[in-house]
Amino acid sequence: MDARAVAKRPRDPADEDNELVTALKAKREVNTISVRYLYHADHQALTARFFVPEGLVEFEAQPGALLIRMETGCDSPRHLYISLYLLGIRASNVSASTRCLLESVYTASAARAALQWLDLGPHLLHRRLETLGCVKTVSLGITSLLTCVMRGYLYNTLKTEVFALMIPKDMYLTWEETRGRLQYVYLIIVYDYDGPETRPGIYVLTSSIAHWQTLVDVARGKFARERCSFVNRRITRPRQIPLCTGVIQKLGWCLADDIHTSFLVHKELKLSVVRLDNFSVELGDFREFV
């Protein structure tokens, strides 16, 4: 038989090579189309990796920490990667007992330097911060490698578990009963201008409110005292006009049934936290309000 005729002859379905091609094709379909339905959510998350000094990785060694990039104002290092736990040491709404617990954990020189840069910055706090996302995995070392989810769910490596967003209990805030199932998560920084130093209050809010202007109207009513200090500063010190009363940034969303209280254990110390299970990262920009 002519070789060209043999080449044009249809392949036998029982041929081993043909079976291999069929199997590979089916596997590609699973990896591309059907994969988002395997765990009842789309796990095609956007991730990034950051190198962090060992002294800044304490509670951050466990998944779920909110990671923030801070401008130092120096040539080296220009940026530091800190978490909400370290930022809570300088939050005015954190209780003295929680602050002492956090200070007893973050005793390394890198953590102390980060706290000094937080205090000495010339601008309002949110002008020097950029929220990056949530920590998923950590490779510990002298310089630790943190894998951060910037958009999507906090899946583990095998995509079989969704990690929770961990918030210190003193920094958690809610304004209404969880009537609806969907809860939007916001980061709120509010400034208190009473006294010689401007003190920031840092909160993580869960709310069913999605409309921006409605959220701002509620925030103005809840933080009436801080707004009065803002107006008083503008009247008494017109040359030192503050920029705003506070800022709001969207972090993502979760379900009302997935909000629980828990403990975070590190070096035999227990930190009371609020755990947002099945949290999905969906970052927005800092938006100021007065």
UniProtKB/Swiss-Prot annotation:
Q: How does it assemble?
A: Interacts with TRX2, MCP and capsid vertex component 2/CVC2.
Q: Where mainly found?
A: virion
The name under which this protein is listed is: Triplex capsid protein 1
Task: Please name the GO terms that the record assigns under molecular function.
Answer: DNA binding
What is a biological process (GO) this protein takes part in?
viral capsid assembly
Q: Which residues form a coiled coil?
A: none
What are the record's GO terms for cellular component? host cell nucleus; viral capsid
Family named by the database record = Belongs to the herpesviridae TRX1 protein family.
- Which InterPro entries does this entry report, sorted A to Z? Herpes_1 (IPR004999)
Function in brief: Structural component of the T=16 icosahedral capsid. The capsid is composed of pentamers and hexamers of major capsid protein/MCP, which are linked together by heterotrimers called triplexes. These triplexes are formed by a single molecule of triplex protein 1/TRX1 and two copies of triplex protein 2/TRX2. Additionally, TRX1 is required for efficient transport of TRX2 to the nucleus, which is the site of capsid assembly.
Question: Where does it reside?
Answer: Virion; Host nucleus
Species name for this entry? Human cytomegalovirus (strain AD169)
Keyword annotations: Capsid protein, Host nucleus, Virion
